[in-house]
Amino acid sequence: MAESYDVIIIGSGPGGYVAAIRASQLGLKTAIVEREHMGGICLNWGCIPTKALLRSAEVLDHANHFKDFGLVLEGSVKPDAKAVVGRSRAVSARLNAGVGFLMKKNKIDIIWGEAKLTKPGEIVVGKSSKPVVEPQHPLPKNVKGEGTYTAKHIIIATGARPRALPGIEPDGKLIWTYFEALKPDALPKSLIVMGSGAIGIEFASFYRSMGVDVTVVEVMPTIMPVEDAEITAIARKQLEKRGLKIFTSAKVTKVEKGAGSITAHVETSDGKVQQITADRMISAVGVQGNIENLGLEALGVKTDRGCVVADGYGKTNVAGIYAIGDVAGPPMLAHKAEHEGVVCVEKIAGLPNVHPTDKGKVPGCTYCNPQVASVGLTEAKAKELGRDIRVGRFSFAANGKAIALGEDQGMVKVIFDKKTGELLGAHMVGAEVTELIQGFVVAMNLETTEEELMHTIFPHPTVSETMKEAVLDAYGRVLNA
């Protein structure tokens, strides 16, 4: 007889494991199915290990500027690729084990294998086709295995994987995805990065800090295309100052593989083609949802462009089947997945006043140097929607703390509705702006007006004062510029 649960979640990434914990907290008998690593891509091969790599890059960048701070370094500092990667993998392993601990603590059953929906309320779990690839990421103890399981509610949280362009498919040797880029045996001397979204530009920034000659090729007119164009123009200037070569409105039309190198044919907006040769290429042209082999078609679950169609509560068109996180479509961000997981489970549990996920208030963060962070509408999008707006800006170059830190290259930009004073969007570039953006996220979520922001006391000296000054600037009241 099949073991029965209230909720079964397929996938243990940020959306899946957080949904499982919240379900258990609400008294629902819960199981989670995983075929590879607890914590999903984010924890094992994405958000967390890349931040560890970028921290090593940041420390190295600081060391190379000791003289600017009156410090004398005897000798030189150089990266040890093996040690840098080793630290990153150790950070990931620690958190991987932490997810297993949280499952045990919250009395959540772990089912190991690949799940397939056979009918509403039932899954069959078979052997995983993706075995654990690192000894520091062992299987949790006392997991359940292959078999049939039933549940009143089944949540699909299977995440996403790299998208590949025809003829330029990653081979794990010369053409990498994030997987190979995270754990190189040695640093290449030169690198082509195809795509300048968060994944592409973060790896470009990391490898440049490590001393690698990096070329970025982006098909759109600006890097980080989802971000505000004024902000990304500042970021591009700083990245190029660090030595990155960036092509926008350009595309890789074909590649030629050699013995230990790869040549990309890059077509620019004027129709000309350049040949760029490098040791390695990273393909970072987007991701697509993991919807295959789940039995969705047989059950009539709607999909669109490689993702499951779900509403703000995670409901699909088939009763009892839900989807959250990357597999449910953009923005494909871990924190959106976590929030969707909580919302979905609270709705299942029948809690009152559960609000659907508002994708317009999901912040985005890119951890390159300089960092970029945002929430809400860009200036271009606000105008496209016909909003009458006020725009405020404030430069880090006029902020005392930023100058003291030696981090005066940055800006905060805010967009308000001229009639209502509603904060429509906030955009930042500069050191640690990924830690600042949450202030505007809270303000937007609470529907804070411009007057309330202008009358909020910000501590001095802090870089966060740039946020208030940007708001003041939108209304002609800026104090320090």
From Swiss-Prot:
Disulfide bonds join 42-47. Its EC number is 1.8.1.4. NAD(+) binds at residues 195-199, 218, 284-287. Keywords: Cytoplasm, Disulfide bond, FAD, Flavoprotein, NAD, Oxidoreductase, Redox-active center. One of its GO terms (biological process) is 2-oxoglutarate metabolic process. It is found in: Cytoplasm. Lipoamide dehydrogenase is a component of the alpha-ketoacid dehydrogenase complexes. Belongs to the class-I pyridine nucleotide-disulfide oxidoreductase family. This is Dihydrolipoyl dehydrogenase. It comes from Rhizobium etli (strain ATCC 51251 / DSM 11541 / JCM 21823 / NBRC 15573 / CFN 42).
